[in-house]
């Protein structure tokens, strides 16, 4: 101690802050100068001093010490302003979602970084002794970023996927977080805590594996005699500090000459003095020895290892350097983060360097060398193809700037730039060839509104999804979602509305689905629509319509349609001339009877006019259908006496139109008989009145189907055979039945004849047959009874709607029997006979003002689910009555397709109150393509999405005048000229509903507008509507959109609007918000122009979404999107500059030699690539040997560099030699390959590299092998000691294998001896023992040979340098960073 006191006078007083780093430097210098013992004394004093001062100071931390940075307010405000502008651009469709996200993250990141920089100077100026300020730089745990969270702002947090949440936390912990901010920050904060715990265990496991690999490496000799080394030179962007670190403590491999003079000899260790001389003399390259070029097989020599880290001398013999290396790499693992919360380069490009203008001036460059593009923030820019020279000239100064290729130029040619303005952005990673790994990330954009999708450019299918709906964008373009309410009709699988129909809609605000409004509207045309398709009820009864039916009254037609159609209903309508049948399937059990299907047939006269009480449709119930001929009888219960007797059997020629008998009866009877009609010439094989059995041959190729009595009647041209089945009774006196002929007897009437006292269970028909005059007998024939149920309950088919008006069509159900009473019905063979037909009779109420005698009927075709269905439309043509008592002219409305005559009378003022209700819920249907077959949908364009823009000579007068001006405008100006040669289309909305839909005070209409004007306007103004391709727009009407007029934006153009001054406007064109249409016209909302009129535009509002090339578009053009559907998927690159796997996982990934996807520096592949290339150059025998050597050298260097890079990025310093020892172990194995193999090793065997070389030399033949990269786990399971392997992992497996192979463990390593409790073969006390063994090794011959061999190899390497340069990546950098 006295020594120190004495020297104190000479010491210089140093007034500087000593933090952790300065302390490190101080201690290392002290050790260099004074040695260990002396330094420890000094440090002791420092310690005492430090604690003494800390005790007297007693720093405490209170909440008042957290001072918020004053400039924070306006910084945050500024950032918010920028975000707002960004949001606006996104809304206008100028930037897409990914660009917006990137930009907002960068805005906030910059803000928070700026605040962080402000923090330090702010403390220094306002309160230098602030405890927070003092502590933040004390070198204790915690750093500026934590202080920044306390007094600056917390900034951006990441979400569980590792993406940044673009909502920053603006408050700091001093001010306190809001609830939202707290929830956002929870994940990141928890993650930090959990990470620390997980990290500790990970680092521990890593250390264990590392030690396992290298535990047997001990320093055992002084010099192994290698003459190889690796070159270290300060090039390659290596900083001088790292270079010095690499050199100090190493041993030189060669003499270093400066001219003729040798400044350092081989095997000399490098100290700080020597390094300084190297720096002064710039001698390069310097070759140094490294552990992985050591010739020892399983241990290491002193010179290859260099100085011991503990003291400044060469490492001692017997030092367990392997374990030291493993621990020095594993221990800092706890300091490495699992994932940094470094937020800047979350998106591609990391940070870009900016080129700024040196002074004000005009900028010039060659425009041919650039092409326009977008930066990653969506700003317009130019991309340079090649290096570009940019000239900035100001007055007389010319300044040249060279901009590298692939950079963005942010200014235009000949633009005036100001000083310090950013003119170009150099993309990070272009200047050097550093391998920034990019990964691709998908981001889905979801639609936030519902409507119809539109593309503004061509979109092509991705080749692999030719039939799917995945489309790629070839160039930057907008996707539009045209607004419109959606009608998801799950109720109806098909819809009756055609495109452009109008419909009354009530929107349910909650559900946002539309249910039809049944109010009566202005147009008094009634259309009825009947559709009768259904699936059959069980048991084959009349159709069962499950579910309530709906009537859509959409202002023009009332449609009635069944609510639910089942899957199995067969809905293909067959159309014949003027009648079509809609078949419906009866139940499965009835199918077995093989009856043809029945259906409802609707018949319409050819002229389409139906009279009152005419039959509109009939339905043949399959229950009343017989396949055999017979006679129908009906009447009251009991005997029908009207029937004539024998002439029943007379044949009547069937008329083409049979009279129909309306049934008033409950039941009728059918007496079956079999009838065969034969040509007159054919032989008959049975006699008249004979009795035959079943299947008797009656003619040449005819057999009887039933047995019974045969009657043969010969007509002029044919013979008619009838076979009556039944019992034959010969008359007895007491038999009462026999007296009657041709009568029906009800069941229960028994015969009086006691012998055959037999009750008849069913109805019977008694018929007397007299073959001769005197003889007769009675034939008792079975009768089929039909009860008439209400065949089809029409209430279910076409329910009456309570809201319908009285003048509606009425339908009555009438059952008709098709054949007269007692008339024989002849069935032609194999056809069925329908006995009863149910008819629908059309009728309508009388009107007070006189009746309509005829109606028009027409078929409407509705296509749904790919099937075409026909519906019947009945127009009751009526003249509406105006409340003013005047008749209105009939104006033709293009809505009634099939009759063509002007049947519609439009009257907008049917009631005064009507108009107001009308304007709210009138809409137009737009049909849309929908892939979903089960559930069609349509959009209702409703007025909430519409705006109109009026500017009438700038008049700000009241709405009234505007309205009247517009209407007084001469409506006869043709619009055709401005529209070009496109056809007209049915109007979007009826004139009345769309024109006045915006008037907010409806009373005006009645006050100011005369009807005459209206009439004129009606006739003249037509709307034009077409799509972009110039076709008249009519998409596949599978599903519908209903337009409400409120979905349309009205944009009124000024009167002096002329085309030259402003944009030419076409229907179908899309307009973004903020586009000026006319000179002083207002800005309009974005949307598609639907209607161009003389004085106004109608714009259907739409939301643009920008998409860049390569984005995937989901769905089809014109398809319906619901809220929350995926609209576009962007694929953007995100730099993996070690933010995703960094720190520990990254080290582990390198050490375990795992190939993780999309990491280009995939080492195993590289190793293989080098193997192949070198073999190609040098030919086989040399190729393998040198190939393996070179590959191994190369991969070792790059491995060391990669591991070092991770640690350095985290500020952890580890000496290269530790990493080198580990790397040596995982790269020191080779795989014996098949070709040219020796009989020593089997192919595919893993052997040590040195062993392979020695065996090759001993056998004097080349062993072919190739380098292989083992991970640390595999390397630990591939050592020479099975005990060490078994104690690491998979004990049973390792031991079993070792036993089978009969392996011997020589107990060379540490672990084996520890396991067996022997003495460990390490420790510096072993010196003498090792030295003795060195005496025997000094036979120089072997060494000389070896050296020659190696020198030879070196020369080859140097000669082939040029070759390698051309074929080996990275110019084979043999350098250590």
Curated annotation (Swiss-Prot):
GO terms for biological process: DNA-templated transcription. It comes from the Eukaryota. SUPFAM superfamilies: beta and beta-prime subunits of DNA dependent RNA-polymerase (SSF64484). Its main location: plastid. Binds 1 Zn(2+) ion per subunit. One of its GO terms (molecular function) is DNA binding. It catalyses: RNA(n) + a ribonucleoside 5'-triphosphate = RNA(n+1) + diphosphate. InterPro entries: DNA-dir_RpoC2_beta_pp, RNA_pol_beta''_euk, RNA_pol_Rpb1_3_sf, RNA_pol_Rpb1_4, RNA_pol_Rpb1_5, Rpb1_funnel_sf. The keyword S-adenosyl-L-methionine does not apply. It holds the Pfam family RNA_pol_Rpb1_5. DNA-dependent RNA polymerase catalyzes the transcription of DNA into RNA using the four ribonucleoside triphosphates as substrates. PANTHER family: DNA-DIRECTED RNA POLYMERASE SUBUNIT BETA (PTHR34995:SF1). Belongs to the RNA polymerase beta' chain family. RpoC2 subfamily. NCBIfam families: rpoC2_cyan. This is DNA-directed RNA polymerase subunit beta''. The gene is rpoC2.
């Amino acid at each position: 101690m006295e020594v120190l006191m004495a020297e104190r006078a000479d010491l210089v007083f140093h007034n500087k802050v000593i933090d952790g780093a300065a302390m490190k430097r101080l201690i290392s210098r002290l050790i260099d100068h004074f040695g260990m013992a002396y330094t420890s004394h000094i440090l002791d004093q420092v310690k005492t001093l430090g604690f003494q001062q800390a005790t007297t100071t007693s720093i405490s931390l209170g909440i008042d010490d957290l001072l918020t940075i004053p400039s924070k307010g306006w910084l945050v405000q500024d950032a918010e302003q920028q975000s707002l502008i960004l949001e606006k651009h996104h809304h206008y469709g100028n930037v897409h979602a990914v660009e917006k996200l990137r930009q907002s993250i960068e805005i906030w990141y910059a803000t928070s970084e700026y605040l962080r920089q402000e923090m330090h100077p702010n403390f220094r100026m306002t309160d230098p002794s602030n405890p927070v300020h003092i502590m933040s730089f004390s070198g204790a745990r915690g750093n500026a970023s934590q202080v920044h969270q306390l007094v600056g702002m917390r900034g951006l947090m990441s979400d569980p996927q590792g993406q940044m949440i673009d909502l920053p936390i603006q408050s700091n912990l001093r001010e306190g977080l809001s609830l939202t901010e707290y929830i956002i920050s929870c994940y990141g904060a928890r993650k930090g805590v959990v990470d620390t715990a997980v990290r500790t265990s990970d680092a521990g496991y890593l250390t264990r594996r590392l030690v396992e690999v290298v535990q047997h490496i001990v320093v055992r000799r002084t010099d192994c005699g290698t003459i190889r080394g690796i070159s270290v030179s300060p090039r390659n962007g290596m900083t001088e500090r790292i270079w010095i670190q690499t050199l100090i403590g190493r041993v030189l491999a060669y003499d270093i000459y400066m001219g003729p003079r040798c400044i350092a000899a081989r095997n000399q260790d490098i100290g700080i003095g020597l390094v300084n001389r190297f720096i002064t003399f710039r001698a390069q390259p310097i070759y140094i020895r490294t552990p992985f070029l050591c010739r020892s097989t399983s241990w290491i020599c002193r010179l290859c290892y260099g100085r011991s880290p503990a003291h400044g001398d060469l490492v001692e013999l017997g030092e367990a350097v392997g374990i030291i290396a493993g621990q020095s790499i594993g221990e800092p693992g706890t300091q490495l983060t699992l994932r940094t919360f470094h937020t800047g380069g979350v998106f591609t490009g990391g940070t870009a360097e900016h080129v700024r203008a040196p002074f004000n001036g005009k900028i010039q460059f060659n425009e041919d060398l650039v092409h326009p593009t977008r930066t990653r923030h969506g700003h317009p820019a130019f991309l340079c193809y090649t290096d570009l020279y940019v000239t900035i000239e100001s007055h007389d100064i010319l300044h040249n700037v060279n901009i590298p290729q692939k950079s963005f130029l942010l200014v235009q040619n000949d633009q005036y730039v100001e000083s310090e303005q950013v003119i170009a952005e150099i993309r990070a990673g272009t200047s050097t060839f550093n391998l920034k790994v990019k990964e691709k990330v998908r981001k889905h954009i979801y639609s936030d509104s519902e409507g119809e999708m539109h593309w503004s450019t061509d979109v092509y299918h991705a080749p692999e999804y030719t039939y799917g709906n995945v489309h790629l964008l070839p160039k930057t373009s907008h996707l539009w979602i045209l607004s419109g309410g959606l009608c998801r009709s799950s109720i109806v699988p098909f819809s009756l509305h055609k495109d452009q129909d109008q419909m009354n809609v009530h929107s349910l605000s909650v559900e946002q689905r539309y249910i039809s409004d049944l109010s009566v509207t202005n147009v008094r045309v009634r259309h009825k629509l009947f559709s009768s398709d259904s699936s059959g009820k069980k048991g084959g009864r009349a159709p069962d319509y499950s579910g309530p039916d709906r009537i859509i009254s959409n202002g023009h037609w009332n449609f009635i349609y069944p609510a639910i159609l089942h899957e199995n209903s067969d809905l293909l309508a067959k159309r014949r001339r003027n009648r079509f049948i809609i078949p419906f399937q009866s139940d499965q059990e009835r199918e077995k009877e093989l009856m043809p299907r029945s259906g409802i047939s609707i018949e319409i006269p050819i002229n389409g006019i139906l009279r009152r009480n005419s039959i509109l449709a009939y339905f043949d119930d399959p229950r009343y259908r017989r396949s055999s001929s017979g006679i129908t009888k009906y009447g009251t219960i009991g005997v029908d006496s009207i029937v004539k007797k024998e002439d029943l059997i007379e044949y009547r020629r069937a008329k083409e139109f049979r009279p129909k008998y309306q049934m008033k009866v409950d039941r009728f009877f059918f007496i079956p008989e079999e009838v065969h009609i034969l040509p007159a010439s054919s032989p008959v094989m049975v006699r008249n009145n004979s009795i035959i059995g079943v299947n008797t041959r009656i003619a040449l190729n005819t057999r009887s189907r039933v047995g019974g009595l045969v009657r043969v009647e010969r007509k002029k041209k044919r013979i008619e055979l009838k076979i009556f089945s039944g019992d034959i009774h010969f008359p007895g006196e007491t038999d009462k039945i026999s007296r009657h002929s041709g009568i029906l007897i009800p069941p229960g009437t028994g015969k009086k004849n006691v012998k055959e006292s037999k009750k008849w269970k069913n109805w019977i028909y008694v018929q007397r047959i007299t073959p001769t005059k005197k003889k007769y007998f009675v034939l008792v024939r079975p009768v089929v009874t039909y009860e008439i149920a209400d065949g089809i309950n029409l209430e279910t088919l076409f329910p009456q709607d309570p809201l319908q008006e009285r003048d509606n069509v009425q339908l009555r159900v009438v059952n008709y029997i098709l054949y007269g009473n007692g008339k024989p019905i002849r069935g032609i063979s194999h056809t069925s006979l329908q006995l009863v037909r149910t008819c629908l009779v059309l009728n309508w109420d009388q009107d007070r003002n006189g009746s309509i005698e005829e109606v028009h009927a027409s078929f409407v075709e509705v296509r749904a689910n790919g099937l075409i269905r026909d519906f019947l439309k009945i127009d009751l043509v009526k003249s509406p009555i105006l409340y003013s008592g005047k008749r209105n002219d009939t104006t033709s409305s293009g809505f009634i397709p099939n009759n063509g005559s002007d049947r519609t009378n439009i009257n907008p003022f049917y009631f005064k109150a009507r108009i107001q209700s009308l304007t709210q819920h009138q809409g137009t249907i737009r049909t849309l393509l929908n892939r979903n077959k089960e559930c069609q949908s349509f959009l209702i364009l409703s007025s909430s999405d519409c705006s109109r823009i009026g500017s009438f000579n700038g008049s700000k007068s009241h709405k009234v005048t505007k309205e009247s001006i517009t209407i007084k405008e001469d409506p006869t100006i043709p619009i055709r000229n401005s529209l070009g040669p496109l056809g007209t289309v049915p109007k979007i909305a009826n004139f009345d509903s769309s024109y006045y839909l915006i008037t907010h005070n409806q009373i005006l209409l009645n006050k100011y507008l005369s009807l005459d004007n209206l009439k004129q306007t009606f006739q003249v103004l037509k709307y034009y509507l077409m799509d972009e391709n110039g076709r008249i727009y009519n998409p596949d009407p599978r599903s519908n959109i209903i337009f409400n007029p409120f979905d349309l934006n009205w944009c009124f153009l000024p009167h002096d609007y002329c085309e030259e001054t402003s944009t030419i406007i076409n229907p179908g064109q899309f307009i973004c918000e903020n586009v000026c249409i006319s000179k002083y016209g207002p800005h309009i909302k974005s949307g598609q122009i639907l209607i161009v009129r003389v004085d106004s535009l109608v714009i259907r509002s739409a939301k643009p979404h920008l998409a860049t090339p390569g984005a995937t578009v989901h769905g089809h053009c014109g398809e319906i999107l619901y809220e929350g559907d995926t609209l576009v998927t962007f694929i953007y690159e995100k730099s993996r500059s070690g933010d995703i796997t960094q720190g520990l996982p990254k080290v582990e990934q390198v050490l375990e030699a795992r190939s993780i996807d999309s990491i280009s520096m995939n080492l195993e592949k590289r190793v293989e690539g080098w193997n192949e290339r070198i073999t190609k150059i040098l030919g086989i025998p040399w190729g393998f040997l040198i190939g393996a050597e070179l590959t191994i050298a190369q991969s070792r260097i790059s491995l060391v560099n990669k591991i070092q890079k991770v640690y350095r990025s985290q500020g952890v310093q580890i000496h290269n030699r530790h990493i080198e020892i580990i790397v040596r172990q995982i790269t020191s194995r080779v795989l014996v390959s098949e070709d040219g193999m020796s009989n020593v090793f089997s192919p595919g065997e893993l052997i040590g590299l040195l062993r392979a070389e020695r065996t090759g030399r001993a056998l004097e033949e080349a062993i072919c092998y190739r380098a292989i990269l083992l991970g640390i786990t595999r390397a630990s399971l591939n050592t020479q000691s099975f005990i060490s392997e078994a104690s690491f992992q998979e004990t049973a497996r390792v031991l079993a294998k070792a036993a089978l192979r009969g392996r011997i463990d020589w107990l060379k390593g540490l672990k084996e001896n520890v396991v067996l409790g022997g003495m460990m073969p390490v420790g510096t006390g072993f010196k003498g023992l090792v030295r003795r063994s060195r005496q025997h090794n000094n036979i120089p011959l072997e060494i000389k040979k070896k050296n020659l061999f190696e020198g030879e190899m070196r020369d080859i390497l140097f000669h082939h340098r040029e070759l390698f340069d051309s074929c080996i990546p990275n110019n084979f950098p043999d350098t250590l960073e």
